[in-house]
């Protein structure tokens, strides 16, 4: 006690500057600052005050006489005054213990109007701060039930802290100081100049608004700090809640943390969170922020997350898009088997492996059977994983007045928009008209160009009627045939076919970088609002906003329903009677958008992409020049040329001429029209034959298709007859040639590449006009052989087909009898002539006949020939010699063209070889000929297929070695299909490069 009494005068005599320099004075200080002992942190930082404190002495403590000249007298005076000082000190201590004031010496506690308040002992400058103090500021809601408005925030400090004694005000104008939070501590700062004796009114703020201008207390200066929220990295849920809490009205029983967006039921839990877990605790010196502020790698195309609480940098736009899904909760990739949703494609593909492990090679969703797990996995990725990563805002335009926005996947509009990427067809009456730029883009992508229709031709694509099941996004044939490189039925002065149904707008898609997958991001763009199925969308679905969309559970239920409906759709007319097809009414296989071919089997799709797709072409063969004969219908002879006499056709004897007469049933079909085989009516054009929705049988390949669209695709891309070039007609008719013609003539001039199945000489030359051949038409039962499914059905209907009609520019049907080359046809091989290479012998041939003859007679790798079997003879009957000779002599059948009479004089084998059978084998009729053929071979030369029912004949594939590929172990029912296989698809061509 005495030491403290003695030290008191010494401390008062020292200047405040000396007090700042000496630490021992702080320990022995007995001034009212010592009463702040409950706050252990306050004395350490309270000591450096503002400059005005240096020349102002605390008035509460009386200053003893100062006489530095006589220290002895001063000590004597102290000894004399000691009892009185002791009494005063004791009184002061008692008053200090009784008084609740524990604040700084610049302030004092006062009573005004019966209320405690704090006033300034001396003038306080703006920017003066006190702190730090242990506590926090809690946001409180304004209760509407309270009559008196209270503060929106609450000060939470220790009960003994003097900050609780400061009267609080709500407005900044009424306050001259503020309490704010900084670095997990509370600070009190003077915001306005307070005169001596003035009262302090404090306002609670969550963060400082202005920078203090006090030059001494720079450590407490919050001016250079950014708002707390910008340095906090919150979770997406916290960020959203924190943005709401900034302006939210909070109940009294809820204690939220505005920085983190977390609500607490107890104030103690909130305090613990604020002290130890709050995100605002992260400051520059903390280890968490140190890890945040470490230098990050920079990328040339770096993207930054727009969320202010996240600010994650992504190396690319795609990675930013994937990252943004973590904020929005978007899961655009859906497994259609179990309806699981994923944020990234990789996760969805990884999930699909679960189904490959459990399905044992069978897709339980669509019944697809695969031999390996990899093929099944590719099938699942291609067909049972919805969506591709990409900006859906680029492929959906809600309208002219609305900007393109990215729709969330849990909305109906987003799901329907995405499903358009996989929908097969868009009806013409609902689909928007794509812009010309988009059309040109689609045309180049599909590997063909389109020209406008000629002479009133149908500008739209004739497609199957709506009663036929729509399984694939195939563009109908007439639209394809209108391109410059298409051998379609588009010819000058062509009228629309009466059988053409309503046009259908076909969705155009681009090929994806992933084989068999859906289009890549941004690849599908259309102008206007896309068509959306009516049974899913409302009429005003184009303007449907996202907030009114149904829940995600409804979307998943709709997806499940669509999947089950798709599984229940059979091969019949699922779209009949106006039944909507659905979003997933397309084929269960895969579609090659470059070739516009849809496969029901994923294996066929991959084989097509690897071996036959038009995208495999060499770079020097661009898609736009693949088919140089655009609308060059005049390149063929005019309509009147159908009756010109052809010297090469005028063989000696009436029999061949009668053959020509009866063989001209349909000049367009006979001359290699695309619909040449099986014309429905003699006078119908090729357009009528090909566009007939009921036509599904390819007689050249003996394949019957379930849909007309598949049939047209087959005729365009895969038919054995499509590779035959339209031969040029002779410039002028000549006299009849000699009795014999060369066996192998020069191939015709090629006008495009990749027509190389049957290089028949002058196939399609006009029939002779001179002589009695064109006039009489023998109603022989064999006249209907090439075009009728039943060889025994006799008909005299082909006669009207002799009327002149334009010959279409199309391939030749192999099931018809080829015509010989005119002797004056050009013999020089063009630069792009076909060549055929024998892999085993490394010998190239420019003629298919020479190549087949080599493979038949000379090639050591050729399979051993078995004895040919005649389909019209008993099963044990053997054919001596050539099967073609046997059919012509024994049964009176002309393989490719019907004979005029059973006893017609046959031509020499050398003359028949290039015309009837290039390899000595007779191409069979694609129809079940044995049903109406004679069973007795004894009546040779007089029997025709209409003589009576035959004996049981071998199966169509039982034609011996004629239709059996030993290397591939495949038996064919049609010779033309077998030849096409040997030329294009056989495994022996794996190492060849056939131009």
From Swiss-Prot:
UniProt GO cellular component terms: cytoplasm; nucleus; transcription repressor complex
Region (Interaction with CTBP2): 811-817
Residues bound to Zn(2+) 4: 838, 841, 854, 859
Binding of Zn(2+) 2, residues: 592, 595, 608, 613
Consequence recorded when altering residue 280 to A: Does not affect the interaction with GATA1
Region (Disordered): 1-103, 424-526, 616-694, 721-827, 892-960
Compositionally biased residues, Basic and acidic residues: 15-36, 908-922
InterPro entries with a match to the protein in the record: FOG (IPR039746), ZF_CCHC_FOG (IPR034731), ZFPM1/2_PR (IPR049361), Znf_C2H2_sf (IPR036236), Znf_C2H2_type (IPR013087)
Biased composition (Pro residues): 728-740, 764-779
SMART domains: ZnF_C2H2 (SM00355)
Major location (coarse): nucleus
UniProt modified residues of type Phosphoserine: 99, 143, 286, 397, 497, 500, 651, 684, 803, 822, 925, 927
Molecular function in Gene Ontology: DNA binding; RNA polymerase II-specific DNA-binding transcription factor binding; transcription corepressor activity; zinc ion binding
Impact when changing residue 256 to A: Does not affect the interaction with GATA1
Protein family according to the UniProt entry: Belongs to the FOG (Friend of GATA) family.
Assembly and binders: Interacts with the N-terminal zinc-finger of GATA1, GATA2 and GATA3. Interacts with corepressor CTBP2; this interaction is however not essential for corepressor activity in erythropoiesis. Interacts with TACC3.
The protein, known as: Zinc finger protein ZFPM1
Organism of provenance: Mus musculus
């Amino acid at each position: 006690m005495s030491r403290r009494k003695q030290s008191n005068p010494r401390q008062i005599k020292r200047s405040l500057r000396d007090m700042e320099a000496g630490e021992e004075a702080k320990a022995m200080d007995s001034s009212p600052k010592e009463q702040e002992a409950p706050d252990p942190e306050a004395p350490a930082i309270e000591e450096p005050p503002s400059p005005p404190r240096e020349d102002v002495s605390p008035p509460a403590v009386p200053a003893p006489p100062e006489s530095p000249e006589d220290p002895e007298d001063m000590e004597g005076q102290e000894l004399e005054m000691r009892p009185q000082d002791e009494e005063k000190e004791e009184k002061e201590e008692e008053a200090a213990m009784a008084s609740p004031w524990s604040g700084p010496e610049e302030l004092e506690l006062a009573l005004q109007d019966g209320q405690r308040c704090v006033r300034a002992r001396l003038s306080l400058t703006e920017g003066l701060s006190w702190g730090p103090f242990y506590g926090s500021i809690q946001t409180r809601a304004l209760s509407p039930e309270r009559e008196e408005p209270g503060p929106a925030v609450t000060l939470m400090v220790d009960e003994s802290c003097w900050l609780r004694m400061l009267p609080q005000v709500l407005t900044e104008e009424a306050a001259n100081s503020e309490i704010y939070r900084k670095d997990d501590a509370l600070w009190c700062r003077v915001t306005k100049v307070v005169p001596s004796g003035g009262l302090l009114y404090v306002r609670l703020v969550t963060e400082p608004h202005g920078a203090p201008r006090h030059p001494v207390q720079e450590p407490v200066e919050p001016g250079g700090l950014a708002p707390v929220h910008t340095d906090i990295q919150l979770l997406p849920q916290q960020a959203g809640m924190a943005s709401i809490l900034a302006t939210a009205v909070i109940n009294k029983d809820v204690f939220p943390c505005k920085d983190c967006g977390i609500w607490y039921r107890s104030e103690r839990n909130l305090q613990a969170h604020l002290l130890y877990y709050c995100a605002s605790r992260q400051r520059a010196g903390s280890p968490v922020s140190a890890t945040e502020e470490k230098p990050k790698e920079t990328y040339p195309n770096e993207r930054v997350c727009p969320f202010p609480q996240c600010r994650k940098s992504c190396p690319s736009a795609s990675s930013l898009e994937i990252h943004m899904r973590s904020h929005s909760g978007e899961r655009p990739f859906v497994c259609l088997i179990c309806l699981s949703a994923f944020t990234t494609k990789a996760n969805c593909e990884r999930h699909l492996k679960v189904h490959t492990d459990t399905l044992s090679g069978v897709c339980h969703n669509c019944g697809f059977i695969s031999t390996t797990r990899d093929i099944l996995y590719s099938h699942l990725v291609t067909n049972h994983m919805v969506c591709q990563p990409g900006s859906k805002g680029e492929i959906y335009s809600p309208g002219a007045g609305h900007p393109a926005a990215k729709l969330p996947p849990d909305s109906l509009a987003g799901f329907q928009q995405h499903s358009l990427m996989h929908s097969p067809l868009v009806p013409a009456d609902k689909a928007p008209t794509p812009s010309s730029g988009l059309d040109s883009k689609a045309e180049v992508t599909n590997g063909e160009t389109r020209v406008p229709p000629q002479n009133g031709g149908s500008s739209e694509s004739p497609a199957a009627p709506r009663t036929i099941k729509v399984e694939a996004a195939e563009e109908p044939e007439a639209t394809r045939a209108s391109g410059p490189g298409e051998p379609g039925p588009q010819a000058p002065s062509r009228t629309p076919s009466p059988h053409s149904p309503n046009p259908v707008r076909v969705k155009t898609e681009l090929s994806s970088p992933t084989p068999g997958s859906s289009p890549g991001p941004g690849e599908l763009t259309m102008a206007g609002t896309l068509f959306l199925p009516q049974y899913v969308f409302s009429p005003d679905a184009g303007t449907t906003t996202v907030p009114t969309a149904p829940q995600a559970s409804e979307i998943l239920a709709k997806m499940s329903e669509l999947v089950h409906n798709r599984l229940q759709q059979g091969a019949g007319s699922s779209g009949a009677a106006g039944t909507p097809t659905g979003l997933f009414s397309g084929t269960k296989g895969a579609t090659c958008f470059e070739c516009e071919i849809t496969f029901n089997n994923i294996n066929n799709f991959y084989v097509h992409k690897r071996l036959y797709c038009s995208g495999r072409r060499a770079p020097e063969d661009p898609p736009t020049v693949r088919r140089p004969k655009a609308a060059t219908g005049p390149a063929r002879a005019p309509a009147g040329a159908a009756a010109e006499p052809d010297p090469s056709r005028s063989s000696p004897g009436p029999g061949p001429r009668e053959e020509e007469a009866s063989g001209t049933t349909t000049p367009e079909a006979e001359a290699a029209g695309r619909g040449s085989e099986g014309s429905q009516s003699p006078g119908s054009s090729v357009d009528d034959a090909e566009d007939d929705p009921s036509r599904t049988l390819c007689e050249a390949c003996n394949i019957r298709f379930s849909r007309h669209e598949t049939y047209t695709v087959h005729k365009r891309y895969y038919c054995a007859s499509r590779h035959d070039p339209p031969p040029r007609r002779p410039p002028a008719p000549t006299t009849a040639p000699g009795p014999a013609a060369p066996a192998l003539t020069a191939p015709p001039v090629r006008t495009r590449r990749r027509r190389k199945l049957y290089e028949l000489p002058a196939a399609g030359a006009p029939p002779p006009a001179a002589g009695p051949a064109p006039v009489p038409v023998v109603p022989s039962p064999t006249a209907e052989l090439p075009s009728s499914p039943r060889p025994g059905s006799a008909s005299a209907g082909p006669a009207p087909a002799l009327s002149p009609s334009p010959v279409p520019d199309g391939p030749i049907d192999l099931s018809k009898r080829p015509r010989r080359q005119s002797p004056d046809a050009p013999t020089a091989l063009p630069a792009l002539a076909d060549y055929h290479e024998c892999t085993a012998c490394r010998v190239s041939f420019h003629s298919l006949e020479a190549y087949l003859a080599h493979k038949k007679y000379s090639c050591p790798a050729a399979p051993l020939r078995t004895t040919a079997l005649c389909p019209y003879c008993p099963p044990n009957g053997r054919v001596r010699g050539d099967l073609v000779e046997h059919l012509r002599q024994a049964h009176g059948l002309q393989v490719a063209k019907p004979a005029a009479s059973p006893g017609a004089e046959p031509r020499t084998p050398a003359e028949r070889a290039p015309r009837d059978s290039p390899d000595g084998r007779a191409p069979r009729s694609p129809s079940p000929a044995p049903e109406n053929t004679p069973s007795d071979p004894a009546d040779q030369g007089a029997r025709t297929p209409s003589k009576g029912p035959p004996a049981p004949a071998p199966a169509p594939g039982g034609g011996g070695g004629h239709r059996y590929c030993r290397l591939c172990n495949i038996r064919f029912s049609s010779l033309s299909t077998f030849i096409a296989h040997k030329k294009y698809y056989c495994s022996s061509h794996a190492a060849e490069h056939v131009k």
